């Protein structure tokens, strides 16, 4: 199966993910990833689909995530860049130790958990993502009692491998996520 178009990827996501939050999280990550692809001169479609499908097996297989999806992606002949990115985004989760070795993988690792911070912040302050202030988001990153399940270390590891600092990354996500409805 070739890499699906956006509508096909969305249908695939919906066939495996029923939870509204997980679907919205996937959309947030996909949108941010497409923004990064354009910003860095890469393929926005590949990056969008990678972001959209990165947690496709989480709801069905939380204790082994992303093992199942990695198998599916290989069986479907998805690009190796996507497969590596999904594996690396699980760094330090379920005993995964693969670090990102591509810009796609680094961006996914940096973006995934940060989207959780953005989502939680928006629940507390219902403003559009594009109107959020980087200073406020960074303050919430430092507050480990806020969105306590978010693994902040992976955000920093992703930024390091992407070659950007946290300030730039937060500002990029404010810009990239600005198009999403709140």
Locate the predicted segments by residue.
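Short polybasic/polar patches that bind polyanions
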Residues: 14, 34, 38, 74, ...
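Divalent-cation-assisted or electrostatically stabilized phosphate/pyrophosphate-binding catalytic cores
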Residues: 75, 130-171
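Conserved active-site and cofactor/substrate-binding residues in soluble primary-metabolism enzymes
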Residues: 4, 24-28, 64, 81, ...
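Divalent metal-dependent catalytic cores for phosphoryl transfer on phosphate-bearing substrates
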Residues: 39-144
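Acidic/His-rich, divalent-metal-binding segments that scaffold phosphate/diphosphate chemistry
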Residues: 1-61
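Active-site hotspot residues in diverse enzymes, especially metal/ion-binding acidic/histidine motifs
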Residues: 27, 31-39, 45, 154, ...
């Amino acid at each position: 199966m070739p890499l699906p178009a956006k509508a096909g990827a969305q249908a695939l996501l919906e066939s495996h993910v029923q939870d509204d939050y997980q679907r919205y999280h996937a959309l947030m990550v996909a949108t941010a990833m497409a923004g990064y692809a354009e910003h860095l001169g890469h393929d926005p479609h590949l990056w969008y689909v990678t972001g959209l499908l990165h947690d496709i097996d989480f709801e069905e297989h939380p204790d082994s995530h992303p093992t199942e999806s990695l198998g599916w992606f290989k069986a479907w002949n998805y690009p190796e860049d996507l497969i590596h990115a999904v594996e690396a985004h699980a760094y330090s989760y379920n005993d995964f130790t693969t670090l990102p070795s591509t810009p796609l993988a680094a961006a996914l690792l940096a973006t995934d958990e940060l989207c959780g911070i953005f989502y939680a912040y928006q629940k507390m302050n219902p403003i559009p993502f594009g109107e959020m202030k980087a200073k406020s988001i960074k303050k919430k990153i430092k507050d480990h009692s806020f969105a306590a399940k978010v693994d902040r270390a992976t955000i920093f590891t992703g930024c390091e491998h992407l070659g950007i600092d946290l300030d730039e990354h937060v500002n990029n996500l404010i810009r990239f996520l600005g198009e999403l409805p709140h």
